[in-house]
Amino acid sequence: SVIPFEVGRSSSGRVTRGHRFMGARSIEIHTADEYMDKLYDNYVIVDHNKRREKMLSGISAIGKELAATVDAQPRLVEENCFLVEYPVPFYGSFDKAFLELPEEVLTTVMVHHQRYMPVRGSDGKLKPYFVGISNNRATEMGVVVDGNERVLRARFADAAFFWEKDLERPLS
């Protein structure tokens, strides 16, 4: 049975919502036992451990496809796990010319600014790819990838500009 309570303008009840873009706007829950399954059917993975598993499985598949290693740092995986309801890993690429920048600059932009995971070759060096986590299984994932590539390109261009400016001034 429903335990009556209110938080702000929301009252408890038997109706919830699925994923914002992919799920039903209204889902009636008859018993607590069906809650997680009904939400899963509407693209919300309630259990964060299952979200993490889905995310890591997709990241692993991308690594195999690229014949590379995705630098899925635990902190970043955890952060992404709690940012999305239905994780959809994807990968994008960037211009190899950016690999001339120091690795620390590139990984800072990818990991800390964009929450992307760097991709490394068997030699441990960065490859011109990144892995991101979308909260949407878009019909056209290409649009999602293109948008993320554009954002990263702009961030890297800014980083390159400031790196070049820094090199103009000697340290001493």
Sequence positions of predicted segments:
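His/Asp/Glu-rich acidic catalytic environments and adjacent acidic regulatory segments
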Residues: 1-168
